Every structure is written in structure tokens, then in C-alpha cells.
């Protein structure tokens, strides 16, 4: 089962106080690319961390 967290979680992150959300990488066969993850999160001034099949962005 695919882990869909993209847009919905992004909106939840904006609303929520924690601001932690994750990003899907459908083009990489579900694998998280560390470089892409960090680049994506950096655009929003977040830190990116890879998990097996998604990228999670943390504030700071």
C-alpha cells in the first residue's frame, strides 16, 4: 500500500503547530533520495530526513 502524504499533510502541517510533514517520491520507485528530500524541504526552510519510502520535513 502506497504512503500518500504529499499535499494533504502539507496543508495539515501549515495548520498544525508541529509543522512536520512528509513528501512522496513516486518517480523513485517509492525510495527516498536523500539529496532530493533535503532539497525539497529546504525550499520551505525545513530539514529533510529520509525514511524507507518517504521524506519527512522537520522545522529548524
Swiss-Prot record:
The record marks 49 as: Basic residue of the functional dyad. Its main location: secreted. The modification Proline amide is found at residue 59. Residues 1-22 form the signal peptide. May block voltage-gated potassium channels (Kv). Belongs to the short scorpion toxin superfamily. Potassium channel inhibitor family. This is Potassium channel toxin MeuTXKalpha3. It comes from Mesobuthus eupeus (Lesser Asian scorpion).
